[in-house]
Amino acid sequence: MANLTIVTEFILMGFSTNKNMCILHSILFLLIYLCALMGNVLIIMITTLDHHLHTPVYFFLKNLSFLDLCLISVTAPKSIANSLIHNNSISFLGCVSQVFLLLSSASAELLLLTVMSFDRYTAICHPLHYDVIMDRSTCVQRATVSWLYGGLIAVMHTAGTFSLSYCGSNMVHQFFCDIPQLLAISCSENLIREIALILINVVLDFCCFIVIIITYVHVFSTVKKIPSTEGQSKAYSICLPHLLVVLFLSTGFIAYLKPASESPSILDAVISVFYTMLPPTFNPIIYSLRNKAIKVALGMLIKGKLTKK
C-alpha cells in the first residue's frame, strides 16, 4: 500500500499575502457568506412553514438551499478565519473534509438542478399530467438520488486524491483545498487514475448541463405559444434564473479541465468563486426576487403569521 503522505498540513495561499488585501478579502467573503446564510435559511424556513409552498418546485428549492449552505460553509468560514488571523494552514484531515464536502455538495447540486429543470419542463409542457408525474414519492426519490450521487462522486475523488503522496511542497495555490491544485503539488508519478476520475466526472456533469439546456429549449418553445403575456413573463422569470445558476456552476468545468500549475494563478481563485460562492449567494435572490408566493410568505413570516399546517 502506497504511503499516503508525509505532509501533515497544507498552506492555503489564497488571493494575496498582503495585509490590506487579506482584510479586504475577509470583509468581502464575510458579507457574501452572511448574505448566503440569511437567504438560504429564510428559504428553508418559508418553504417548511408555509403549507401553500408544499409543492414539488419548493421542495426541490428547499433541498437546493440546504446544499447551498453546505457548499459555501465548506470554504468561506475557513478562508475568512485564515485571512483574519494571518494563518493559512489547514490540517491534512481538514483538507480531506473540504474536498469531500465540496464535491458532494457541488455534484449533488448540479444533479438536483437537472431534476428541477425536468420539473419545470413537466409543469409548463405537460401541465395536465404534472401531479401524476411529480407526485411526492417521486420528488423524494429524485432528491435522495441527487444527494447519494454527490456522496458517491465525493468518495471516489477524495479516496483517489488522498491515496497520492504529498512529500514536497505543501502550498496549495487556492483559498480552499481543491483537487486540481492538490494534484499539482503531488509527488506521485502515476496520476492517471485520478485524472480519469476527473474526466468521467466532467463528462457526467456535462451530460447534466446538456439535459438542462435541451429541457429549457422545449420549455421556451412552449412558452412562446402561451397567448398571455403575463403567463410568458411568469415562465421566463422561473426558468431564466435557473439557467443563470447552472452557468455559474458550469465554471467548475474550466477549473477542472484547466491544467493546474504549482505557480500561483489569481485566475484559478476567481473561477472558483463563481462555482463555490456565487450560486449559494444568488440562488435565494433570483428564486425569490420575482416570486410572488415567496414574497407573500416572507411578509407573513415577518409579521409572525406564518405557521405550518
From Swiss-Prot:
Its biological purpose: Odorant receptor.
Protein family per UniProt: Belongs to the G-protein coupled receptor 1 family.
One cellular component term from this protein's GO annotations in UniProt: plasma membrane
Cellular localization per UniProt: Cell membrane
TM annotation in the entry: 24-44, 53-73, 98-118, 132-152, 195-215, 236-255, 269-289
Pfam families: 7tm_4 (PF13853)
Topology Extracellular: residue spans: 1-23, 74-97, 153-194, 256-268
Keywords of the record: Cell membrane, Disulfide bond, G-protein coupled receptor, Glycoprotein, Membrane, Olfaction, Receptor, Sensory transduction, Transducer, Transmembrane, Transmembrane helix
Protein name: Olfactory receptor 14A16
Principal localisation: membrane
Glycosylation site residues: 3, 87
Organism: Homo sapiens
InterPro entries linked to this entry: GPCR_Rhodpsn, GPCR_Rhodpsn_7TM, Olfact_rcpt, Olfactory_GPCR
One Gene Ontology MF term: olfactory receptor activity
Cysteines joined through disulfide linkages: 95-187
Gene3D superfamilies found in the cross-reference section: Rhodopsin 7-helix transmembrane proteins
Membrane-side (Cytoplasmic) residue stretches: 45-52, 119-131, 216-235, 290-309
Membrane-topology annotation of the record: Multi-pass membrane protein
CDD domains: 7tmA_OR14-like (cd15227)
